[in-house]
Amino acid sequence: MRIIDNLEQFRQIYASGKKWQRCVEAIENIDNIQPGVAHSIGDSLTYRVETDSATDALFTGHRRYFEVHYYLQGQQKIEYAPKETLQVVEYYRDETDREYLKGCGETVEVHEGQIVICDIHEAYRFICNNAVKKVVLKVTIEDGYFHNK
């Protein structure tokens, strides 16, 4: 899991790479996004604004997409662990790009302005004590992306 302190730092770290630039464009478009409505750029990037106050019971893992969270309001704990240290509860489904696991991991707390990138070799679960508002992006892991954009 990568935690980046703010959007400017994200821009500097990921200055090259079209898919990361598209993430910044999506985040900058949040004033035009209704909560809960998903938008996409082909199948290489999807994004939505959500307000979340639920705690995940299980860890979630992905294989084809990084999950990126940009926090707009509030703070949230995230428990994460390498997938190989967790026990599979529901096997990976290609249709959803998800697998569910259980176990114990390391916990971090993130807050407004920070960006979290969930790596595909790890699984994570979000722990909420209060509602958080964030932009959730799913970004392809593939190198060949956004050819027509």
Curated annotation (Swiss-Prot):
Pfam families: DUF386. GO terms for cellular component: cytosol. GO terms for biological process: single-species biofilm formation. SUPFAM superfamilies: Clavaminate synthase-like. It comes from the Bacteria. InterPro entries: NanQ/TabA/YiaL (IPR004375), NanQ/TabA/YiaL_sf (IPR037012). Required for full activity of the EbgA enzyme. Exact function not known. Heterooctamer of 4 alpha and 4 beta subunits. NCBIfam families: PRK10202.1. This is Evolved beta-galactosidase subunit beta. It comes from Escherichia coli (strain K12). The lineage of its organism: Bacteria, Pseudomonadati, Pseudomonadota, Gammaproteobacteria, Enterobacterales.
